[in-house]
A protein has these predicted regions:
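Amphipathic alpha-helical interaction segments
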Residues: 44-52, 109-113, 131, 135
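Helical hydrophobic small-molecule/effector-binding pocket
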Residues: 39-68, 92-94, 98-103, 124-126
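Solvent-exposed, amphipathic alpha-helical segments
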Residues: 28, 32-36, 113-120
Length: 144
């Protein structure tokens, strides 16, 4: 096995270890965001991306913690989050053209709101996941 001392020589704290373990999932999320941004229907792409991200956050609370964290310990995590934000920005721009997202909503807002939805789903019953995702999407719409 690997001793605690060996782990802490490579990772200064638990969050750094969790970031390293979450890198592959974060890469998958970036890839999904890029695919959603190039979808024929941007709104469908956004819904698919949010569902994909929410499922992974619910499956892996450590991954959710990495997405929720404002401070990254590793450059790889910061780079992947920046890449994710760029892809989500492109996706939001496409959805804005359909009139389905407020002009003031940014990629970081979507990530923070999704983290809130994940927390709410974990706190309640899993049966509310689709309802909360629908509420999030409706809340992103411009006021009427």
């Amino acid at each position: 096995g690997v001793g605690v001392g060996t782990v802490y020589r490579h990772f200064p704290n638990r969050h750094a270890l969790v970031e390293a373990l979450s890198a592959e999932r974060l890469r998958e999320l970036v890839d999904e965001a890029q695919a959603a941004a190039s979808a024929d229907d941007p709104l469908t792409g956004l819904r698919r991306l949010l569902g994909f991200a929410l499922d992974r956050m619910l499956d892996d609370p450590d991954f959710a913690a990495v997405l929720e964290s404002a401070g990254d310990t590793g450059a790889q995590t910061s780079d992947l989050k920046a890449e994710l934000d760029r892809a989500v920005t492109g996706l939001l721009n496409g959805v804005r053209l359909t009139g389905a997202v407020r002009s003031s909503v940014e990629a970081d807002d979507v990530r923070r709101l999704l983290c809130g939805v994940a927390h709410a789903v974990r706190s309640g019953s899993g049966e509310v996941k689709d309802l909360y995702l629908d509420v999030l999407l409706q809340g992103l719409r411009p006021p009427r």
